[in-house]
Every structure is written in C-alpha cells, then in structure tokens.
Design a protein with these regions (language model features):
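Flexible, glycine/small-residue-enriched loop-and-beta-strand segment within the central core
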Residues: 2-10, 22-117, 142-144, 148-158
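Active-site phosphate/pyrophosphate- and oxyanion-stabilizing loops and adjacent acidic/basic residues
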Residues: 127
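Conserved active-site beta-strand element of glycosyltransferases/polysaccharide synthases
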Residues: 139
Length: 159
C-alpha cells in the first residue's frame, strides 16, 4: 500500500489580484473581477464572466457562458449547466446560468440550464435547482424549493 504523500498546491496568480489553484481549467475568454479565488480542479468554461470578490471552491463546474455577479460563493462540486438537451454542441441552443451578486451556491448542488439565482439568495448544499430563485431567498432540496428568507437564514447563522 502506498503512503500518502503531501503535495504542494500550485498557485496561479491571475490579474486583478485574483488567484487560481492548479490544476484547474480556465476557458477561453474567461473574464474575472478583482480579488477572486478559484479552487483546484475547478472547471470554468469559455466565455464565463465572474464579478469581483467571488470564491469558486474546488471541483466546481461552471459551463460555458455562465455569469456570476460580485461576491458570489460557489461551493465544492457545485455544477452550473448550460445545455438543457445535451449534447447540442451548438451554443445557440445553450441557456447559461446567471448567479446574481451576493448569492451562495452550496457544495454539490446542480443548477439546470437557464436558471437565475437572485441577489443575496442561497441554494442549499446538494440541491437541484430547476426554477429561478428570487432575491433574498433560501432554497434547498431535490428539486429545490423555498425554505426561508435570507434574513431568517442570517439570524440562524448568528445563533
């Protein structure tokens, strides 16, 4: 049996005071804001735009054309899809996901093509989102449903 061997992460310094950890995939025409962090094994597709102060955790998958606003958190193994009827191969059929500023995408969650996550909303870990989430709401489950307002969520976090 082989022994565990500690490995050093390879820090990739990006412009605008942002960082990615190798290995990861940063697609062609990827555009990021200031002070972003992208975890190891993340896949950021082509023509993806993410705003300032975003954090993409390891092994997250963000399909081509998706848009994330400022201060978005995407948990590990989260998946943002763009192709509702794969494999289309033709971007004119794609419906990229939009995640608005201040939103949180829990680890292991999946967002179906064309969905929008509203400002300051939360999608719980392991959820499957098939509808748009309005601003300031928390949704969870498979399929994801409304659970509470963001203000109630913040109150529970502080307890």
């Amino acid at each position: 049996m082989a022994e565990d061997v500690p490995q050093q992460s390879n820090r990739i310094t990006l412009e605008k005071d942002s960082v990615a950890w190798a290995p990861c995939m940063l697609g062609e025409n990827f555009n990021h804001g200031k002070k972003c962090s992208i975890g190891a094994l993340a896949h950021i597709g082509r023509n993806v735009t993410i705003g300032d102060n975003c954090r993409i955790q390891g092994s997250a998958y963000i399909a081509d054309g998706c848009v994330l606003g400022d201060e978005v958190f995407v948990g590990p193994n989260a998946t943002l899809l763009n192709d509702k009827y794969p494999p289309s191969g033709d971007s004119k059929y794609w419906k990229p996901v939009t995640v608005e500023s201040g939103a949180v995408i829990g680890g292991g969650s999946t967002i179906i093509p064309g969905c929008n996550v509203g400002k300051f909303s939360v999608l719980g870990a392991g959820s499957v989102l098939t509808k748009n989430i309005p601003e300031n709401q928390v949704w969870a489950g498979n399929p994801a449903i409304f659970v509470m307002n963001r203000s109630e969520y913040e109150s529970k976090r502080e307890q």
